[in-house]
Swiss-Prot record:
Regulatory domain, as annotated region: 391-511
EC number: 2.3.3.13
HAMAP family reported in the protein's UniProt record: LeuA_type1 (MF_01025)
EC class of the enzyme, as a word: transferase
Residue intervals of the Pyruvate carboxyltransferase domain: 4-266
A Pfam family this chain is assigned to: HCS_D2
One annotated Gene Ontology cellular component of this protein: cytoplasm
Cellular location(s): Cytoplasm
Molecular function terms from GO: 2-isopropylmalate synthase activity; acetyl-CoA C-acetyltransferase activity; manganese ion binding
Entry protein name: 2-isopropylmalate synthase
Keyword Transferase recorded: yes
Amino acid sequence: MRRIRIFDTTLRDGEQTPGVNLNIQEKVDIAKQLARLGVDVIEPGFPLTSPGDFEAVQRIAREVEGPYICGFSRAIIRDIDETWKAIKDAQKKCFHIFISSSDIQIKHQLGKTEKDVLEIVKSTVYHAKQYTDEVEYSPMDASRTRLEFLYEVIEAAIDNGATVINIPDTVGYATPIEFGELIQKIRKNVRNIDKAIISVHCHNDLGMAVANSIVAAMNGAQQIECTINGVGERAGNAALEEVVTHIAARKDYLGFETGIDLSQLYKTSKIVSRYMGIPIPVNKPIVGKNVFTHESGIHQDGVLKERSTYEVIDPRLVGRDDSVILLGKHSGRHALKVEAEKLGYDLDEERLNKLFNDFKKLTDVKKNVTTADLESLIIESAAKAVEEAYVLEKIRVVSGNIETPSAKVVIKDSKGNLLEAEQTGNGPVDAVFKAINSVIKETENLTLYKYSVSAVTEEMESLGEVSVTLREKEKLYTGIGTHTDIITSSAIAYIDAINKAIAANARAQKN
């Protein structure tokens, strides 16, 4: 059976989702989970975007084993040299070189000609090949590129060392039949295409990313590029969990398979959702809350008699296990560490100590702590992997329908000083945020960009998880807070986002 390689770009293309700004520890955690999932290639970021991105790619290259770690680079010699410094320590490494190839992008974005682009591709692919055996080349906007030029530039890339040719539908313009025919034409008209793997990278602007990816594979593509939960710019990318589950469910018809451990899908989806602060829609295929829920009486009757009557896959196949492990106030550090490892988190001593303290605080207000609660605490801990300039010490809120909501906060700064403030607002959360703003001077240039709330479990005493994104000019900072009291969660998340903004500005000044 033909094997399709899975190239994950959650940490590069996926992180370009508006409002997403992962810290280094979050990126490392996601990369390690992608390795457990079994992806063939991880594109961990764009190293030259910032010193933080460079460090994240470098750490992933050093710490993550199994998949290829792919360095994403513009078709510029000096960029390739610098990108190599970020990926060189990886067990398995490769390059991904890209440049626009469509008439509209060559003319209006690059200000060049097709001849210019052809020469750039030859020289940069050859240069990258001097560093590593595997080099991927992407003619960006391939689905809108003049076919004769597309064939020519692909041939030139392969002649100069490219081992993977990626065909991007950059703006999600193609339809499935059309995209499948494009792959066929490339296989037929590119003289040396047998010397390279054909990859596809589909965007979802017209809702066809997964369909285009599957049809491309049916027509000979050997690698599919995708992201967890379909995250990415604009309408996102092909959703990895949908692509690989479709291949697994219909391998009898499709005749190919992947190396993905499907049982890790749901866990990976949740980690990415929480770190990025993007809730999973309830009807999202494979990982949405309602996907295996049956409301119709006829459907319920059928599922009770035989699950396959209305479920095309067993939920357990993709890691949708409803079993719950309960921890309580008498649970020790070892039990906590074991459960964290079962969830896929390898915690060092510092992170374990922090988690244990947070866990003990939670058991004071919640009798039983579930695996979902524990995972939420771990994710919140990773989200706070920056030096905390401010920490919430106390909070008191007065609210109701007969008086103006007010909030009092006590915040400790990095020097141990306690800062107090009380404010009223248009609701308790607004009052809390105004109180925080009144004592933290660094909030002057920050504005609220996004606020979302979700319950970690469905119990009455469930942890409430809040994601707050703040904007400072063109930069976005996302904080996460969890607590059984949603107002407290909001305050924690708000201060977390502020701390990230402060840390980012400090790094920028240092550099």
